[in-house]
């Protein structure tokens, strides 16, 4: 329990020392070797003890660490970052590639549309008394769409379509029988 508490305190102190240079908890902090951790100066703060206000003697290690920290310049040394930082990488890549839109291209003049509009208006002018075009016979046959030989006779909605268009074969048979009976009855009289 004591070791984890000191580790947390050392991480906090490390964070306070290097807050302007790098963040705690990045992948780079956990990947450093023991040599790099030993080179960092550790500042210690005096914390009030729970021994009732009595003065406590500091160990030689703490005094030497404070002396070393005092000897070093106050400006923290810049460490090379080793890790994955999304924000800093995108900023660097953006500065490497610069795209300027419209700066290199000369402005083109837009041609006037007045001559084209006049020719289009002349093509669709209905004021002229010209004779309408005649349809070719093939187009007329397709528009009528009557009979078995039309292109839609084999379509999905062409069930019961015969030579005479859509018809019911049973009714056609009954009509033919009635007409034959009528012809036979007329012949007998």
Curated annotation (Swiss-Prot):
Gene (name only): Pcnp
Function: May be involved in cell cycle regulation.
Subcellular location: Nucleus
Source organism (scientific name): Rattus norvegicus
Gene Ontology CC entries for this record: nucleus
Low complexity bias (residue ranges): 48-58
Pfam families according to UniProt: PCNP (PF15473)
Keywords: Acetylation, Cell cycle, Nucleus, Phosphoprotein, Ubl conjugation
Region (Disordered): 21-84, 145-169
Any one of the GO BP annotations: proteasome-mediated ubiquitin-dependent protein catabolic process
Biased composition (Basic and acidic residues): 32-42
Phosphoserine: modified positions: 64, 88, 98, 130, 158
Name the record gives this protein: PEST proteolytic signal-containing nuclear protein
């Amino acid at each position: 329990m004591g070791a984890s508490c000191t580790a947390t305190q050392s991480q906090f102190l490390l964070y306070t020392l290097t807050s302007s240079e790098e963040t705690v908890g990045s992948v780079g902090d956990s990947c450093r070797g023991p040599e790099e951790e030993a080179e960092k100066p550790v500042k210690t703060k005096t914390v009030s003890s729970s021994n009732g206000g009595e003065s406590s003697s500091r160990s030689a290690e703490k005094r030497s660490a404070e002396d070393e920290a005092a000897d070093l310049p106050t400006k923290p040394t810049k460490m090379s970052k080793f890790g994955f930082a999304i924000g800093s990488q995108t900023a660097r890549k953006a500065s490497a590639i610069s795209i300027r839109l419209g700066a290199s291209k000369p402005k083109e003049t837009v041609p006037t549309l007045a001559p084209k509009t006049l020719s289009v208006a002349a093509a669709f002018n209905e004021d002229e008394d010209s004779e309408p075009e005649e349809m070719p016979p093939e187009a007329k046959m397709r528009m009528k769409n009557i009979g078995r030989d039309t292109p839609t006779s084999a379509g999905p909605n062409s069930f019961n379509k015969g030579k005479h268009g859509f018809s019911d074969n049973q009714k056609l048979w009954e009509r033919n029988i009635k007409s034959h009976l009528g012809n036979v009855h007329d012949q007998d009289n």
